[in-house]
Amino acid sequence: MDRAVSRVVLENEEREAKNTWRFVFRIAVLLLIVMTLAISAAALVYSMGASTPRDLASISTAISKMEDKITSSLSSNQDVVDRIYKQVALESPLALLNTESIIMNAITSLSYQINGAANNSGCGAPVHDPDYIGGIGKELIVDDTSDVTSFYPSAYQEHLNFIPAPTTGSGCTRIPSFDMSATHYCYTHNVILSGCRDHSHSHQYLALGVLRTSATGKVFFSTLRSINLDDTQNRKSCSVSATPLGCDMLCSKVTETEEEDYKSVTPTSMVHGRFRFDGQYHEKDSDRTTLFKDWVANYPGVGGGSFIDDRVWFPIYGGLKPNSPSDIAQEGKYVIYKRYNNTFPDKQDYQIRMAKSSYKPGRFGGKRVQQAILSIKVSTSLGEDPVLTVPPNTITLMGAEGRVLTVGTSHFLYQRGSSYFSPALLYPMTVYQQTATLHSPYTFNAFTRPGSVPCQASARCPNSCITGVYTDPYPLVFHRNHTLRGVFGTMLDDEQARLNPVSAVFDNISRSRVTRVSSSSTKAAYTTSTCFKVVKTSKAYCLSIAEISNTLFGEFRIVPLLVEILKDDRV
């Protein structure tokens, strides 16, 4: 009985235990369901609240604010970029130019102090105003695309005349020579007291100066030192060059006419002089018997020389001694240059015969008139290590007055059109140690010179002539690869007479609008031109030193004509 009761009690307890666990399980399941529903509801509410129309409308506002932040950030970065560009493209070059100016001033001042200590000279250092540093002897216009003749000269500008004029009716100032370096310029001309045709006695005026800018921004040439070489020496055909030691000048010493000189059998006396920064002038006779042993007449080219690689280079021309080694080396050599789009009517063999004869004009007794270049080492000693280069006549025409120029890294020889070829010629020139090599020239068809028939301005065929006039071109417009595109110069715009001086910019075919000195009947002669830039304003200027007729005081007055180079964008 008791065992039966115990079994019943045990079964009841087991049943109650099972019911308890079921209840716990059910409660747990219900709690999980409730929690799941709650989480789902919360998620649903959240998702519905996140995509309300109000929030959707605020998206564009948020994006706009983000755009503003990005734009502000970019603007800030652009300011940095602009500052970097200004520093690199504008301020750094100017700083370099100023540094160059400071260094040049310091070096020049030091050299002056040393020089002054040696000669008791207390002179100051000559150097152009900082406005010109980096604007002298450089490629002034570098342009591959613009028409060269879209550049043109302004009207002539009033500026300080740094060239003395004759003071009597019989006075004569002629044959200007000019050269300008990065620190100073040098100028010289011949002074004759009794008319321009007197060959027996003359003075030589020589000046050293710098470029200045006035308080109103005007360009002017300031003469710092000048001297009039009035002695028993009759210097002629002088060429001047600005060198680190002052103004180097090469002259011939003559007492006879040019025709008589060519008839002689001895070379012409030559002298190398130097006008120092302290105003002292010294010179030394050249060893003509060695240097010019193959010549009967020899002259500097009148145009300026150039300082290249510690040497000064001067143009030379004159007559070779018949059957001398130099004369024999040129025998049979010739070159024919042709006008643009203007062929020769003569037969080829006749052209060649006339071209060969052009080197031996009858005026000088059939002597071969030859071009040459003389280089002299620039040191405290004058006339040191002179070397004469005689280029082949397969490159050069008959010898004539000329000029050696350096612009940028390029060197050129201008040769006056004394022979049959009227357009201006610039021979590219390379130098190696003491010698020079000339290459086929740039020609400027519209930059002509007047001449006597059959070698007048429009002439096109080879002929034997001694004619023309010295009117050098200055390299002005370059390609980016440094080849020459155009030049500036002042030409005499007449067929035969030395009349009508006009300034213009020239390419190989044509010319720009011109600036005239006066009427077409204005008498003129030699012109020599040099261009430079005022770096601060980026304005390019050109100076043409021209011999202009002067009816009251002397036959000619040498006038420095100054123009600004402008651009016509319509061309």
Curated annotation (Swiss-Prot):
- Intravirion topological domain: 1-26
Task: Check the record and name the SUPFAM superfamilies matching this protein.
Answer: Sialidases
Which reaction is recorded as catalysed by this protein? Hydrolysis of alpha-(2->3)-, alpha-(2->6)-, alpha-(2->8)- glycosidic linkages of terminal sialic acid residues in oligosaccharides, glycoproteins, glycolipids, colominic acid and synthetic substrates
Query: Has UniProt tagged this entry with the keyword Protein biosynthesis?
Result: no
Please tell me whether the keyword Membrane is annotated for this protein.
yes
Give the first-level EC class, as a single word: hydrolase
**Any single GO CC term annotated in Swiss-Prot or TrEMBL for this entry:** host cell plasma membrane
Region Involved in neuraminidase activity, as annotated, extends over 234-239
| UniProt keyword terms in alphabetical order | Disulfide bond, Glycoprotein, Hemagglutinin, Host cell membrane, Host membrane, Host-virus interaction, Hydrolase, Membrane, Signal-anchor, Transmembrane, Transmembrane helix, Viral attachment to host cell, Viral envelope protein, Virion, Virus entry into host cell
Q: Subunit structure, per the record?
A: Homotetramer; composed of disulfide-linked homodimers. Interacts with F protein trimer. Interacts with host CG-1B; this interaction inhibits viral adsorption and replication rather than internalization.
Family, per the entry? Belongs to the paramyxoviruses hemagglutinin-neuraminidase family.
Q: What is this protein called?
A: Hemagglutinin-neuraminidase
**What is the primary gene name for this protein?**
HN
